[in-house]
Amino acid sequence: MPPAGSLTDEQLRFFDANGYLVLGSFSSAEEVRAMRDRMAELVDGFDGAGDVFSTKDHRQVKNDFFFKSAENISFFFEEKAFGDDGCLKQAKELSINKVGHALHELDPVFKKFSFGANVSSLFSSLRYKRPAVIQSMYIFKQPGIGGEVVPHQDNTFLYTDPPSCTGLWLALEDATKTNGCLWAIPGSHKNGLKRRMIRDEIDTHFDHPSPTYDLKEFVPLEVKSGDLVVIHGDLIHQSFENLSPVSRHALSLHVIDTEGCEWSKQNWLQRKIPPQPLYEN
């Protein structure tokens, strides 16, 4: 049997037309459990010194902690995790927004998935020549306080010339409209990149204002644990707050082609060491 990432012609046509693709049962229940258990261990060992993550307020990207997370395993709290007194309102494990951005390199459990045959086969199907994971994130979408992710395109933040970013979003729990699943505008990737986030010596800024979108154009991408959503770098996608009592854990990888595509020196994420490719043609 071919790896789960080997795409059929029909799947490739759907991805080309819509800018996303859902692959059912991409990871086994055992693989999902291994990643969730490993993250629980990492959180348990976390001393509580992190930063607040928000997709609305980009002041945090001035923060040296955020920039250094490119090659570290760093913990980011939910915006609503703290009370007026500055203390956590709930347990530590229910307060973290995400962990990033180098799990795929520094942790053996997440590296096993990221460099596995399924992921490599997927990018071979997409005709990548020398794909490399540029960042990885474990996203918790905590019950009751899981923050929204505003409409965006991944190429805004992870730009190559020519653009080559593809996102992989692996559900580690069922994702529904109730607990904050992804939403996307089908075909929106065909309209090109709307704006970029630019990093200079001390700050970041966007080169254009945020576009406005009609919420009626978005469709929900409800998936089961173990399913994978493949996301074109120019696809408009988002997720709403999780106001439910149920979390929505997911692993997100962003992959670029390092052959024939140049990583922008204006991206927020700058590495001291080039990323390891999944394979080389």
Swiss-Prot record:
Name the UniProt record assigns to this protein: Phytanoyl-CoA dioxygenase 1
Sequence positions that bind Fe cation: 152, 154, 237
Pfam families in UniProt: PhyH (PF05721)
Family the entry assigns: Belongs to the PhyH family.
Listed InterPro entries: Phytyl_CoA_dOase-like
Enzyme Commission numbers on file: 1.14.11.18
Amino-acid positions noted as binding 2-oxoglutarate in the UniProt annotation, renumbered to this chain: 98, 137, 152-154, 169, 239, 248
UniProt entry keywords in alphabetical sequence: Dioxygenase, Iron, Metal-binding, Oxidoreductase, Vitamin C
SUPFAM superfamilies hit by this protein: Clavaminate synthase-like (SSF51197)
Function: Converts phytanoyl-CoA to 2-hydroxyphytanoyl-CoA.
A molecular-function term among this protein's GO annotations: metal ion binding
Cofactor(s) annotated in UniProt: Fe cation; L-ascorbate
Catalytic activity from the UniProt record: phytanoyl-CoA + 2-oxoglutarate + O2 = 2-hydroxyphytanoyl-CoA + succinate + CO2
Organism: Oryza sativa subsp. japonica (Rice)
GO biological process: fatty acid metabolic process
Pathway as given in its UniProt record: Lipid metabolism; fatty acid metabolism
